[in-house]
């Protein structure tokens, strides 16, 4: 999207490691309008300090912070409380939870959502969900907290098991101390749940 579609609309992207706030700030240009990142990132599970990135808005007031929170929905992580302006989710994953809806949601202040709705909906990004798909997404939200907590508990147990396996070279999971700085940030902002997603490298 950022390399092939957005340039058609006069939008260019600079790619940086958002876990490194100094690198993010160094990449800001006069015409920068958005800092967009996914945390934890797929598939590396690197964790961006949302509050630290959001502090850049104190210096660069025209910039919006957009966080893809698909891997860490409530009750794991609350980007807006940490200073983000807009949060996006693929509701096909955790929010729906039943594999029978394809869609996404954008969350934020009414003023920001009004701009997105007026400029993008139906013109660029597609149409709203059908009523039945919306109903099924709401159905999934009723069990979201229960499902997510169990996913996270199971993922942590599996990650710890894999980390001690002779067949596994490296496990990437924010809830493991071996993730270093990513773990430290995850402890601070992910409410002790981390995520239900794991990636790992198998030994040759």
Predicted regions and their residues:
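Conserved small-domain helix->loop->beta segment predominantly found in fold-type I
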Residues: 156-204
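Conserved PLP-enzyme active-site core in the AAT-like
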Residues: 1-167, 172, 177
